[in-house]
């Protein structure tokens, strides 16, 4: 992407209900410190995708910036190898991180490239937004570093999923406690439940 002319696209048209939702979600992102007002020459449009539960997911259309981004070739594990590791395990827990990607900070020099435009203003992300081509690789790399010594022993990472597996209930309770403690130490937070 070095030397690329900044890419900026006009906002997409939105229905009145989407505009109301957009205003609320932008305010929520501002309140959480995930975004800030921007003067960046970059700017991607926004759209909403309806989730299974009927709520609206705010999506930034980063397709144009993704076309000029140098792809991180982080190796994804083979599914069959991951499944082989589960042999003999009888207890499993999947950990979801609360706003997973949003727990990763964007390097200050890259923040302007995350900019998005709306009728309510121009903003940029301070945390990793969904939709950037390298977001899954960056997140998986972080999780692999957090759990490096326990990978393939009782932790499997696949993109943004953390799977804890154990042979016995007692082992599993210990492994789960350890995994949650490790996340806490790294200031990463799991969803309750």
Feature roles, as predicted:
Residues 1-193:
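Retroelement reverse transcriptase polymerase core
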């Amino acid at each position: 992407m070095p030397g690329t002319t900044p890419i900026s696209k006009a906002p997409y048209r939105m229905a009145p209900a989407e505009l109301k939702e957009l205003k609320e979600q932008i305010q929520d992102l501002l309140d959480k410190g995930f975004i800030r007002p921007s003067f960046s020459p970059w700017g991607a449009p926004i759209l909403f995708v309806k989730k299974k539960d009927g709520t609206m997911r705010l999506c930034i259309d980063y397709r144009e910036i993704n076309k000029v981004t140098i792809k991180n070739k982080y190796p994804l594990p083979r599914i069959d190898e991951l499944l082989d590791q589960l042999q003999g395990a009888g207890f499993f827990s999947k950990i979801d991180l609360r706003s997973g990607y949003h727990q990763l900070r964007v390097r200050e020099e890259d923040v302007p490239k995350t900019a998005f435009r709306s009728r309510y203003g121009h903003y940029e992300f301070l945390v990793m937004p969904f939709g950037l081509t390298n977001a899954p690789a960056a997140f998986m790399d972080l999780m692999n570093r957090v759990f490096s010594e326990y990978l393939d022993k009782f932790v499997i990472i696949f993109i943004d999923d953390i799977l804890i597996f154990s042979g016995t209930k007692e082992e599993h309770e210990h492994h789960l406690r350890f995994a949650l403690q490790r996340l806490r130490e790294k200031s990463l937070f799991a969803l309750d439940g």
